[in-house]
Amino acid sequence: MPRVWDSRLDALGVRVVTPAGAQVHLVEARWLDASQAGDKFHIFVRVQDANGQPQRDQEFRVRFTTETAETRIERTKGPGLDDFFGNFAMFPGLSYAVDIPSATSEQVTGLVRGAPGNPAANSSFFLVFQRGAPVEPPRPDDGPPTLDETTRRRLVALLDQAQAEIDAARALLEGNP
C-alpha cells in the first residue's frame, strides 16, 4: 500500500524512522497550516488494524523535550466527532515525535507547531498508523520529464511565437505599431 504523504512535510523537516521488524506503519501524514487549522494546534493520531479499520482506545506515545525529555501516552477515541483520532496539543518551540508503544512501530519525528518564521501560528498534523504489512514510501519528485529534441524544438518555437505576439500587443497598447 502506498503511503499518503503531504509533500509540505518534507520542507518542515518531518521524517519517518522505520526500525527493523516494524509491525506498525505510518500510512498517512497530513499537515494543516494556519489557514487550514483554524483554532487547532494539535497532533491528531488514528490507529488502524491490519484491515484498515480504525481502533478506539489505542495508545500512542508523544515524545518532546523541555528542560528534560518528556514522554506522554495518549489514547485514540471512538467514532463520532473525533472519528477515532486521539489528540495532543503542541506548544511553540518544541519538536515532537510520535509512535505506537504497543508494538515495534515507525516513528514520525520533527513535528513542530507553526510555520517557518512563525512558530506560534496554529497548525496541526494528522497521522494514521496501521498494523500489518509495510507501506511503500512516496516516490521522490523526479522533477520535470526530459524532453526529446523534437519536442523541445517545438516548445521553443511555440514560446518564440507567443513572445512575438506579446511584443506586438505591447507595441499596440503603447502606441508604437
Predicted regions and their residues:
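Mid-length scaffold segments of soluble, non-membrane domains
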Residues: 46-69
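Short, acidic Ser/Thr/Gly-rich low-complexity loop/linker segments typical of extracellular
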Residues: 58, 66-92, 106-113
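Short, low-complexity, charged amphipathic interaction modules
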Residues: 143-177
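A short, solvent-exposed beta-strand micro-motif common in secreted/extracellular proteins
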Residues: 94-104
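Short, low-complexity, Pro/Ser/Thr/Gly-rich segments in the mature regions of secreted, periplasmic
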Residues: 123-136, 165-176
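Structured interaction patches on ligand/partner-binding surfaces of diverse proteins
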Residues: 103-131
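Beta-strand-rich domain onsets/edges
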Residues: 1-42, 48-54
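Exposed beta-strand and adjacent loop surfaces of beta-rich binding modules
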Residues: 40-42, 57-61, 95
